[in-house]
Amino acid sequence: MTLKILCAALIAVAILAPAAHAQPAPQNGQNAVVQPVFDQPTNVPGKSLQAVTVSYPPGARSAPHHHAKSSFIMAYVISGAIRSQVEGEPARVYHVGETWSEAPGAHHTISDNASATEPAELLAVFLLDTGDGPLTTDDTVNNEPFR
């Protein structure tokens, strides 16, 4: 069963990555832009497959965050270079075509464009319990959003 789910996620990446890459990365200052690209129940009862692109202008970053508690995530770098760190692991820079995964409940402490001059984009594929959400919840500091 797990192999079928992994295969479905990889097929989604293969299908969605070229379409997501065809759209230019939005340039809106230093904020990452998240664009939903896929949301479909699976043939596994109670599970859904969702995908988003995350576009980073040069030097942009995402706030530290958590994802939906049930979500297993596979990320694929479409363009540029993405610096990522999940709590407890060393930070790493991923380049075009590279992937990483995040286990359910992981705390994503770093997610940013590794370049100050070039945009970057990733595709994140979520396998999660149907109805679980939101997909991403940013951390807060003293009840204020991270900046």
Where are these regions (language model features)?
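Ligand-binding loop in jelly-roll beta-barrel domains
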Residues: 83, 90-91, 104-133
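Glycine- and acidic-residue-biased ligand/ion/polar-headgroup-sensing regions
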Residues: 70-88, 98
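Conserved hydrophobic/aromatic beta-strand scaffold that supports enzyme active sites
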Residues: 51-53, 74, 99-101, 124
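Short, flexible surface segments
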Residues: 58, 79, 96-97, 104
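Short, solvent-exposed loop/turn elements at domain surfaces
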Residues: 62-65, 85, 133-136
